[in-house]
Amino acid sequence: TLPIFIFDDENSKEHINGSASKWWLHHSLIALKQSLDNNLSLYRGDPKDILTKLTETYNVKEIFWNRCYEPWRIKRDKKIKSFFEEMKISVNTFNGSLLWEPWNVVKNDGTPYKVFTPYYRKGCLNSEMPRTPIQKPKIDNLLLDKTNSISIDDLELMPENNWYDEMEKLWTPGEKGAHNKVDIFIKEGLANYK
């Protein structure tokens, strides 16, 4: 298994990440890399080009990624998936960031909810339980691309001035911070929601 992250700042066009998003991503990648015993290869550029090079270098037979839901990313990912499937490389995509797929919790007319309470009633109270997270791969089964991978700093995500000092006191990026926020929400927010 070769865990990778690709920072695609080429395809986004007008959807460029702001400074706070980049700060968050920088620290989330640090946390992810640590959780994988530093076995996370990082790249910047066009995902199709990078994945093509990796499939050739490592004789890849299967590619797995978490789905993105912005329209431009859906379009890009469909093209990439088709390209690799034509090359007889299996592509498996997963919901890695939402409780339910957006198209599974909709109003009776098929349109998305715009108000939280009806969404909550249909999604949280009446839908199937979200899938459980898959187990983290064993660290000894992970590869690291030492030739082409770049450092987190090479992604150039951190702003030049340190306006984020106050934010660092309030927010904890990464999986651990997310688990803490979910626990607080379940105990203090969701349990008391009417």
Protein language model features and the residues they cover:
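Trp/Phe/Arg-rich N-terminal binding region typifying the photolyase-homology
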Residues: 1-130
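Glycine/tryptophan-enriched, flexible segments
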Residues: 112, 118-194
